[in-house]
Amino acid sequence: MKLLASTVLVGAAAASITPQQQVLQNPFKSATKPVSDAWSKSMESLGHLTGSMKGMTAEAKAIWDEVSMLFPEAMEKAAFFSEPKPHTRKPDSTWDYIVKGADIQSVWVENSKGEKEREIDGKLEQYNLRAKKVDPSKLGVDTVKQYSGYLDDEEDDKHLFYWFFESRNDPKNDPVVLWLNGGPGCSSLTGLFLELGPSSIDKNLKLHNNPYSWNANASVIFLDQPVNVGYSYSGSSVSNTVAAGKDVYALLTLFFKQFPEYAKQDFHIAGESYAGHYIPVFTSEILSHKKRNINLKSVLIGNGLTDGLTQYEHYRPMACGDGGWPAVLGASECQAMDNALPRCQSLIQNCYDSESVWSCVPASIYCNNAMMGPYQRTGQNVYDVRGKCEDTSNLCYSALGWISEFLNKADVQKELGVEVSSYDSCNFDINRNFLFQGDWMKPFHRLVPGILEQIPVLIYAGDADFICNWLGNQAWTDALEWPGKKDFNAAKTKDLQLESGHKTGTFKSSGNFTFARIFGAGHMVPMDQPEASLDFLNKWLNDYTL
């Protein structure tokens, strides 16, 4: 669903935005124990990673010291891996389709030089894909053809759940879109029912048709990833974006092999929030395979976290009235954020330079506390500056609880072929694991220039979001170093509008790069502005212009 507000490292579900979350009141100002004691204890609990200390500065070491002193219980729980979800694997005979990666790898063809080579690139032998036909009349989510199932990594005991909806229009010719929610650790099925899918769910668990569903003119795959998110499960774990990318490439390859009727259409990846990390990595992984059956044409990132060094500078302006909405914070809090920014940027730069867990984790901890903490303590919704957080047990949105109730119904799980015992919209252990692997602050924006050389990229942002705000997204797209930077920065901003002439935002575009600001939308643009989001999606899928 969204970027979880992990403002501290967290010993439990502190990645959520509940009042009980331990946000440092004065980040890293005081110490009550000798540094050597703190360092010794933190190293004892994290000793299995001492080989990764390359690039760690004294400043980063000091952050680890201070965190271990302030939150000793959190350090003890920094295990980096989530607990396996209870599950029962169904016999192969219960599935309508099974495609084996080993069978794909066994197909060899002759190239133009007369040499033998594999028809499709990639290490796929350990993967299988299971699929079943979903009876639309059983669930009532949509009337279109649907498939659900799992991608299985038999070697590492990982099982990713997906749910596919055909286009409502012309599935034989309409494009296919993979949708990814963020977190990290939030299920893409929340995107299905809360934002852009065929139906929404009310408090009585009744379904309501969404006339602005993104499958109006495209087939859509909703994927629960990484493992142990949503209906996905594993005996092992994934705690970094790069590892997750291998799984996504395998899923798409096997899916399009099983269902070749969708493989010839244009394919696009879209997502929001932490998908600002996922999508550059997943896209680069796909594009690295020259012999593939994935017809990737473009990517879309909504309110993403992609370049922390640039984006974190814009938390203070967004919270203090410079983002087009009234200020949430007072002058003293705004000044404190300004004062903390140089240290935050220094830590992030060190992370960028070394990409070491020992440098990237302190950057995340310090900057999240200093830049998100003051806003979070007000009780305002971090996903929408226009209001308070109304339901702290469900990341401010009660509908998340309704979605979880619906997806925990036995008849729903049976029809979808679900193999886990329960569904949660977000797995906070996954969020913690990615944080402790240093994944949060890594410079994945550096992959974007290589992507732009091959396919178009759309960065869009609802302008009422705080946590991945439009100011920061606009700034990193302007700052990105790529051959088209000069022309992109000089491009004129144009109005984004519906056919009726109603203005829904602004955008600028040059070459393969487009940035769009969506008016009156928070973190989840399709939820807040459903008509506008479907309109710009259809325009983009048609010819990559808005």
Curated annotation (Swiss-Prot):
The keyword Glycoprotein applies. It comes from Botryotinia fuckeliana (strain B05.10). Keywords: Carboxypeptidase, Disulfide bond, Glycoprotein, Hydrolase, Protease, Signal, Vacuole, Zymogen. Residues 18-132 form a propeptide. It is an enzyme of class 3 (hydrolase). It is found in: Vacuole. Disulfide bonds join 186-426, 320-334, 344-367, 351-360, 389-396. Glycans are attached at residues 217, 512. This is Carboxypeptidase Y homolog A. GO terms for biological process: proteolysis. Belongs to the peptidase S10 family. The active site is at 273, 465, 523. The gene is CPYA. Its EC number is 3.4.16.5. One of its GO terms (molecular function) is serine-type carboxypeptidase activity. Pfam families: Carbpep_Y_N (PF05388), Peptidase_S10 (PF00450).
